[in-house]
Amino acid sequence: MSKIYKSLIPISSIFIGIYAFGVYAFLELGVAVHPIMKANFRAHPAAIYFHIFPSLIALLLGPFQFNEKFRTTKTHLHRLIGKVYLLCILVGGISGLYMAQFSFGGTISHLGFALLAVLWIFTGYKAYSSIIRKMIVAHYHWMIINFALT
């Protein structure tokens, strides 16, 4: 894998994270979305924030977990960040599953976002259960899938 490609994922994750943080932390809720979604955001602010901020934390933490030097030299920190990441996935996934019913775009959109939330939680569970059983390669593969969903 080229150095450019390897750096593209963390850089884009950080920029997306900075943008999302700015929009949801400093702007009026719903200002950056379609007017119909703005009403949904305002009707369910707690669910939106329980989805956005844990998901944002996961998005920002994820790339560091894939850095081989970090994983091998800072094992304790890798494990701690991994637990925080998976907790964020769980909270973001549950709130995302709840919010899927209010998504913009009809039934297909509702089902797509619900499936995304279920797969996000499922792959996080599989990654965690793999590492608990010392299946490091399986854990790594499940985490790649999980972060791709992130």
What are these regions (language model features)?
Residues 1-150:
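Alpha-helical membrane insertion/targeting regions
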